[in-house]
Swiss-Prot record:
The chain crosses the membrane at residues 1-21, 36-56. One of its GO terms (molecular function) is proton-transporting ATPase activity, rotational mechanism. Keywords: Endoplasmic reticulum, Golgi apparatus, Hydrogen ion transport, Ion transport, Membrane, Transmembrane, Transmembrane helix, Transport. Disulfide bonds: none annotated. It is found in: Endoplasmic reticulum membrane; Golgi apparatus membrane. Belongs to the V-ATPase e1/e2 subunit family. This is V-type proton ATPase subunit e2. It comes from Arabidopsis thaliana.
Amino acid sequence: MAFVVTSLIFAVVGIIASICTRICFNKGPSTNLLHLTLVITATVCCWMMWAIVYIAQMNPLIVPILSEVE
């Protein structure tokens, strides 16, 4: 559940950033395309980094050793 919710948050942030980029940096069609490409690429890269770290924590390669403290 948390994976889907956070993925949706990344999607919403990407859409809002794309809209803000289109409004604030409106300098022509080729420049708009470059800015939107950079924003979308940055959003996808941040999401992929988060997803890889999140999924890696589900099945760790090294099992933690618990000490028996009484």
